[in-house]
UniProtKB/Swiss-Prot annotation:
GO terms for biological process: protein folding. It is a multi-pass membrane protein. The chain crosses the membrane at residues 14-30, 49-64, 72-89, 146-164. The gene is dsbB. Belongs to the DsbB family. This is Disulfide bond formation protein B. It comes from the Bacteria. Residues 31-48, 90-145 are periplasmic. It comes from Pseudoalteromonas translucida (strain TAC 125). Keywords: Cell inner membrane, Cell membrane, Chaperone, Disulfide bond, Electron transport, Membrane, Oxidoreductase, Redox-active center, Transmembrane, Transmembrane helix, Transport. Its main location: membrane.
Length: 172
């Protein structure tokens, strides 16, 4: 347990975390540009949550020994993984509902007016797909179902790290 509690204070685990999250973003772009799967609004929101995880990893990598930096990284990690899980869950409900009027997909992402990411970087944040379509599956799970699993694993990992740190070090 002490080994696990020490991980957040080291740079290598944060780099590994950032690398894994970066690979998720690259995978999303591969699905979009090489496999021709058009991302929908919910996909873009999930992509944004993954970007939040990447930002958390970069923050943690910058100075993992500093408690304030770790707290900021933990916070961004928690918000991104929980928000991503909620968005993925809602996306699954959109795909599996039999009521065609239960959900509607917006035409463009609802980013804040001061930060219209879909206008600044349309190749990454523009949504061109339909939220109700299931265009890809692996092992019986759709893309949002896999993202739900991934976000849950990220949240569980954070919970495990924070809990072990609190139990052994009595500090974050």
């Amino acid at each position: 347990m002490n080994w696990l509690a020490q991980l957040p204070t080291q740079r290598t685990p944060w780099l590994l975390f950032s690398g894994i999250v970066f690979l998720l973003e690259i995978t999303a772009l591969f699905f979009q540009y090489k496999m021709g799967l058009a991302p929908c609004i919910m996909c873009i929101y999930q992509r944004t949550a993954v970007l939040g995880l990447l930002i958390a990893g970069i923050i943690g990598t910058s100075n993992p020994e500093h408690r304030g930096v770790r707290l900021l990284a933990y916070s961004v990690w928690a918000v991104s993984s929980v928000w991503g899980f909620i968005i993925a869950r809602e996306h699954i409900e959109m795909q599996t509902t039999t009521d065609p009027f239960a959900f509607s997909c917006e035409f463009e992402p609802n980013f804040p007016a001061f930060m219209p990411l879909h206008e600044w970087i349309p190749s990454f944040f523009a949504a061109t797909g339909d939220c109700g379509n299931i265009d890809w599956q692996f092992a019986g799970l759709s893309m949002p179902a896999w993202m739900e699993v991934i976000f849950a694993l990220f949240a569980a990992t954070l919970f495990l790290l924070v809990t072990s740190r609190l139990m052994t070090k009595r500090s974050l």
